[in-house]
């Protein structure tokens, strides 16, 4: 999807206060958010991309109503949005009015970001809610970056890290605010089906001969969690959403078929994206289950660009070139000369052994 001049101008303006490395990461986030896909479809790729701008150990993404109340959420750590945690959060809010702010309260702090740290007092850390949620995952420092378009809140990012990294400093808070602002286009984008061709976040589950779960990784839990949260009221009446329950709902039948036939394959599609589940009978009479989420190419591109140590301008040139913009169009969008664009493109081609934009797409597709 081509990116228009208004989007480029907004991204460029947001980068101005930041040093080059952080600005490059923010440019990558802004270009991804403006590429025509929704926040839900890029949620799995976001932690790797955001940590280039602000070091984090875990990320949560939340969506809100116009009134600022949470309507949906996703977290790298599924237990943070388990039914038990949500009930505990409600109980904690009832006891401590300011213990867990709504989006509305955060927006009062400004359209960019609201901070949880001032409210993370000793009572918060001593609460059953903290012990069963953030504490269970080792998360000590929490930063809430609200996504607000000037008229209403759309959601927020919850940036979390363990005590070893220390609390978020003023520069990181400003960076988180910029991430929220740059993400507005993706929050406004409807969750329409998009071509999804790149495998991401390989989930693995293995069972014993008796059907018991012998091994499972976090990516598998994340994928099953997303398959379960695809109804009209995702944060109400969740019921039992333990890993064992999710496996029983989504994988037990496929595993049984694999035991009979040797292999089985399923595909699922919902607002979070496309999921491919493969089952194979193992040598010890158990089953190996792999779960891949298929993400749009834009997510794959953003994760490839993250960590390449490109300048902010080169990040934007790379995005525009791969998305199909001509050199003249890129120069117009970035308000630079064609010669400048040619220099950036030549450097990209030399780095990736490419001779054309098509070659560059192939290089990023590997």
Tell me what each language-model feature is.
Residues 245-296:
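PAS-family sensory/regulatory modules and their coupling/dimerization elements
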Residues 324-359:
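Recognition helix of helix-turn-helix DNA-binding domains
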Residues 313-317:
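The N-cap/first-turn positions of alpha helices
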Residues 200-266:
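PAS-family sensory domains
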Residues 60, 202-205, 328:
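Sensory-domain cores of signal-transduction modules, predominantly PAS/LOV
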Residues 171, 187-201:
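Short alpha-helical interdomain "coupling" segment at the junction between an upstream regulatory sensor module
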Residues 2-171, 175, 181, 185, ...:
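Regulatory input/activation interfaces that engage signals or partners
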Residues 302-310:
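Short amphipathic alpha-helical boundary/capping segments
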């Amino acid at each position: 999807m081509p990116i228009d001049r208004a989007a480029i101008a907004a991204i460029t303006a947001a980068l101005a206060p930041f040093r080059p490395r952080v600005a490059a990461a923010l440019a990558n986030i802004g270009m991804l958010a403006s590429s025509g896909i929704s926040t839900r479809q890029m949620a799995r790729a976001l932690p790797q991309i955001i940590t280039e701008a602000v070091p984090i150990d875990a990320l949560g993404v939340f969506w809100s109503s116009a009134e600022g109340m949470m309507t949906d959420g996703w977290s790298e750590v599924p237990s943070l949005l388990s039914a038990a945690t949500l009930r505990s959060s409600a109980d904690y809010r009832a006891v401590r009015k300011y213990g867990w702010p709504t989006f509305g309260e955060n927006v009062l702090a400004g359209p960019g970001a609201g901070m949880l740290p001032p409210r993370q007092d000793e009572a918060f850390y001593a609460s059953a809610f903290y012990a069963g949620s953030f504490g269970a995952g080792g998360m000590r420092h929490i930063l809430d970056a609200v996504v607000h378009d000037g008229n209403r809140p759309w959601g927020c990012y919850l940036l979390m890290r363990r005590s070893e990294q220390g609390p978020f400093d003023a520069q990181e808070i400003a960076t988180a605010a910029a991430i929220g602002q740059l993400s507005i286009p993706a929050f406004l984008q409807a969750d329409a089906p998009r071509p999804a061709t790149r495998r991401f976040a390989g989930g693995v589950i293995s069972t014993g001969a008796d059907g018991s779960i012998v091994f499972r990784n976090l990516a598998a839990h994340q994928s099953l969690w997303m398959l379960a949260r695809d109804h009209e009221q995702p944060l109400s009446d969740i019921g039992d959403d333990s890993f064992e329950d999710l496996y029983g709902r989504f994988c037990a039948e496929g595993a049984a078929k694999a035991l009979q036939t040797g292999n089985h394959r399923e595909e699922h599609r919902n607002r979070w994206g496309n999921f491919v589940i493969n089952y194979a009978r193992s040598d010890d009479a158990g089953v190996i289950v792999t779960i891949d989420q298929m993400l749009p190419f834009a997510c794959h591109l953003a994760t490839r660009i993250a960590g390449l140590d490109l300048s902010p301008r080169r990040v934007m040139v790379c995005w525009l070139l791969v998305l199909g913009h001509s050199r003249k169009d890129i120069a117009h969008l970035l308000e630079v000369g064609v010669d400048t664009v040619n220099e950036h493109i030549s450097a990209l081609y030399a780095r990736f052994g490419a001779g054309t934009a098509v070659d560059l797409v192939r290089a990023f597709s590997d």
